[in-house]
Amino acid sequence: MDKTQPHPLFKLATELGPLIVFFVVNAKFNLFAATGAFMVAIVAAMIASYVVTKHVPLMAIVTGIVVLVFGTLTLVLHDETFIKLKPTIIYGLFAAVLGGGLLFNRSFIAIMFDQMFNLTPAGWRILTFRWALFFAAMAVLNEIIWRTQSTDFWVGFKAFGVVPLTMIFAIAQMPLIKRYHQDPASLEASDAAEGDVSKG
């Protein structure tokens, strides 16, 4: 099935919308009501993404599954620990998958973003390693915040701190992307030249 590229504002809405719902409902009611609303918003965002683009990103699917599992545990057991652990689990999982892939000479960042960037193999490895470190650091940061700060502070950080930090980190990778960028035309020419040599 063909995928269509969503409008940047739509993509931003599906990513930030559930977090804003989580923050607003927590401020008006409590964390348990916010957890239920967050679960509904996550599912709604995935459905909207599929309806508009005919595709749901893998990271969104993984995040949605973890949210539903830990959100359900939070509501059933009436224990806010589970929903607070959710970001740690997600970030830790992403870090482990990216880092583990590098051990087997696989760059999962390249698999996800090869249509957006044309990098050399070395560039993809470095970028993957950096994102693995970033997710590991975010897992540690989440643990520190929810264990040492108030619930309201943690919710505020989750809603308005995580996205800016991620965007800043992503922007900081642009010099690396430019340094290891390879022009598709020159890459095709190189492949053609190698083919001619092998035929000769």
Curated annotation (Swiss-Prot):
Protein name (record): Inner membrane-spanning protein YciB
Organism in which the protein naturally occurs: Bradyrhizobium sp. (strain BTAi1 / ATCC BAA-1182)
The protein's role, per its UniProt record: Plays a role in cell envelope biogenesis, maintenance of cell envelope integrity and membrane homeostasis.
Compartment(s) of residence: Cell inner membrane
GO cellular component: plasma membrane
Lipid bilayer topology: Multi-pass membrane protein
Keyword NADP among record annotations: no
Regions crossing the membrane: 7-27, 32-52, 56-76, 93-113, 126-146, 153-173
Family note: Belongs to the YciB family.
Keyword check for Transmembrane: yes
Keywords: Cell inner membrane, Cell membrane, Membrane, Transmembrane, Transmembrane helix
Pfam families: IspA
Main location: membrane
Highest taxon of the lineage: Bacteria
HAMAP family, alphabetized: YciB
